[in-house]
Regions:
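Mature N-terminal, pre-catalytic/accessory segment of carbohydrate-active enzymes
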Residues: 1-44
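Hydrophobic/aromatic-rich core segments of domains that either
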Residues: 6, 10-14, 18, 22, ...
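Acidic low-complexity segments
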Residues: 13, 20-23, 27, 207-211, ...
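Intrinsically disordered, low-complexity N-terminal segments that are enriched in acidic
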Residues: 29, 34-239
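Terminal peptide-recognition signature
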Residues: 179, 295, 366
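Short intrinsically disordered coil segments
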Residues: 195-198, 243-253, 380-383
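Active-site nucleophilic cysteine motif
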Residues: 288-295, 325-340
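Low-complexity, Gly/Ser/Thr/Pro-rich intrinsically disordered linker/tail segments
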Residues: 400-461
Length: 461
């Protein structure tokens, strides 16, 4: 079922809101405690106040660089960067920052973000490592796109290992820990998958069609206890070039559900600005492919990529993108989905791992429905990268298609696990690296070491 986080849309007391926005988290915590002690406090408000604590933790963890530290880090990578340039990058929202306790703190990876999204600065980087890395990845994608277009379909077979290790002096040896490791979900482009080996016997394995599929374990704690799994999978990508002239607008009941057009609070919401912006982008067309393409073009040409803090710390993910015109792969995918649904085009979430030889890691993308083609993919962040680098063919490709280097772990956003967690997840919206908790509390990030490693990957006809 959908994880109910609708209470995050409810208003907070004005003093607590001001303290949160200004980063005065100790004062905020004191007022939260005061409010929670009131027996007349509405239950919905209580949940929102408790969630705000997680937001504060995430922000403190993500924004730790003072202005001088951020500038020094930038100068190490770009030796000729001036302070005026640094301030301009701050003011045009390239460098992400927040006020915490009255001081400006920058996002820990803001310089990496600058070098990955602003090519003129990447060209000035000492060693140009990021630029070379991106050029290699782009060449790899372009070669595969040409091959897929030529052959019409490509299969990919992969093997990976994932694990969660726990080490903490706040846990008692022998107490039960609960683990959820992500498993591939049966959704296009996945053809098959197999759980080959686990470090411990799983208590429960979700069905293949579970929206966020997991292997669930219960293991007694000991120092550095590790729960691990080895997976194999096969995907098949078929090249499709959606033609608006062939679109019918039909929504077959077997292919499309109410969920594919629904709002899901707190983020997939047809807020007034979202509706106005979508109308402006889409215009008066009734063609679902044209609608989706106009939304894709808006996000990929007007928006830019930015590394994001934990989604728990963002009150309105889609509203954030619409106001700031930047965000990471998940923010862009969720914005695409919400805009599509807002104008009557069915759309849904997909996420998991990108598993190419040059790059292996977490990634999010979207799907939209257009008869007679059925469900099609849209990868706004990869499309935006292609647009920024003048790669029109690759930009067009990621509207309607994916490369086969995808391992989907989730087919829905904000879905509960089976069995559900007892405490707030580190990521209540998605599941790409797994979750862990004890029977009495959630586990903190400094108690956990999560990893995933690609063991092998082969493209095949």
């Amino acid at each position: 079922m959908i994880l109910d986080l609708s209470y995050l849309r409810y208003p907070l007391p004005s003093d607590i809101t001001m303290l949160f926005e200004s980063g005065r988290f100790e004062e905020m915590e004191r007022l939260i405690e005061l409010n929670l002690s009131k027996p007349e406090l509405p239950a919905a408000l209580k949940k929102h106040l408790e969630f705000l604590r997680y937001c504060a933790e995430d922000i403190r963890e993500a924004y730790q660089l003072t202005s001088e530290q951020a500038f020094d880090n930038a100068r190490k990578r770009i030796p000729d960067l001036t302070r005026d340039e640094f301030h301009h990058l701050r003011d045009d929202r390239t460098l992400d920052w927040r006020y915490i306790d009255g001081k400006r703190y920058y996002r820990n990876n803001c310089i990496n973000n600058l070098l990955r999204t602003r090519r003129p600065y990447a060209l000035r980087e000492k060693g140009t490592s990021i630029l070379l890395e991106e050029e290699n990845e782009a060449a790899e994608r372009d070669h595969l796109i040409h091959t897929l277009k030529e052959k019409g379909r490509i299969r990919y077979q992969g093997t990976m290992q994932e694990s969660i290790s726990v080490c903490s002096d706040r846990l008692t040896p022998g107490e039960t820990l609960r683990f959820w490791l992500p498993l591939p979900v049966r959704d296009f482009p996945l053809v098959s998958s197999r759980l080959c080996q686990t470090s411990h016997p799983p208590v429960q394995i979700s069905p293949e069609n579970a929206p966020q599929r997991t292997a669930y374990f219960e293991v007694p704690y000991e120092k550095n206890v590790t729960v691990a799994a080895t997976l194999t999978w096969e995907t098949e990508m078929v090249y499709r070039k959606p033609d608006p002239a062939l679109a019918t607008g039909e929504l077959p009941a077997g292919d499309v559900t109410e969920q594919d057009l629904a709002q899901v609070e707190p983020h997939i919401v047809f807020a007034p600005y979202l509706k106005a912006l979508t109308r402006e982008i889409v215009g008066d067309t009734d063609n679902p492919i044209v609608k989706a393409r106009r939304i894709y073009d808006f996000i990929t040409t007007q928006g830019t990529y930015r590394f994001m803090p934990s989604y728990r710390s963002i009150p309105d993910i889609v509203g954030y993108f619409c106001a700031n015109l930047h965000g990471d792969c998940g923010v862009q995918a969720l914005t695409f989905i919400t805009m599509c649904r807002c104008c009557g085009v069915p759309a849904r979430w997909q996420s998991g791992l990108y598993t190419s030889p040059a790059s292996f890691g977490m990634h999010d993308w979207a799907m939209f429905y257009a008869a007679p083609y059925g469900w099609l993919h849209a990868d706004c962040s990869f499309g935006g990268s292609a647009y920024r680098n003048g790669a029109k063919e690759r930009h067009d490709f990621y509207f309607g298609n994916l490369d086969p280097w995808r391992l989907p772990f989730a087919s829905r956003f904000q879905y509960e696990f089976t069995p559900p967690t007892r405490f707030m997840r580190a990521d209540p919206y998605d599941n790409q690296v797994g979750e862990a908790e004890s029977l009495t509390r959630r586990l903190f990030e400094d108690e956990l070491d999560k990893s995933h490693n690609l063991l092998s990957g082969t493209l095949c006809d």
